[in-house]
Amino acid sequence: MLEQALKDGITLFQWREKGAGSLAGQAAEYEQFARDCLALCRQYGVPFLVNDDVALALKLDAEGVHIGQDDGDVAATRARIAHKILGVSAHSVEEVHSAEAAGADYVGLGPIYATVSKADANTPTGLVWLEEARAAFPSLPIVAIGGINLERAPAVFAAGADGIAVISAICRDPSFVAEFQQLAL
């Protein structure tokens, strides 16, 4: 599935191995799976970010890391990873401001719509929050996440997103990326 998405043109891959059926707790398998995904990303020239695991990102020499609000101090993470890509999940203007001030390269905002990918997801914000964040932070890259599909993607970009993050859409339909590329956004 990852290789097909890479062939179809994804521009960044965030490795997130959590939840039921994940390899979390199986250190050797967890790391090997990450290494395998990293190798594929490198083969296609696509940046590989590790979700929430700074130590693993550094061990693998990944291109970066994405952290949530409960995953550690943003400034400390920036210092630890130096020049690597740092993404931060944010759910309020204050969190976006803090992430930007601490050196985040981009923020992930959402869920924009209801999502089935994350059991503990916040209440969907809709496009209004995305529009407000774009107006308040015109130069900070914003990646929208949560319930985004082919039908919703154009409105998400029109509201100010620089990119979208998808899990379910690709898992349900491996041709999602190729179909997405056909949209005139």
Language model feature labels by segment:
Residues 1-66, 71, 79-106, 122-125, ...:
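Conserved N-terminal beta1-alpha1 strand-loop-helix module at the mouth
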Residues 117-119:
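Glycine/threonine-rich flexible loop motifs
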Residues 162-163:
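C-terminal structural segments of small proteins and small subunits
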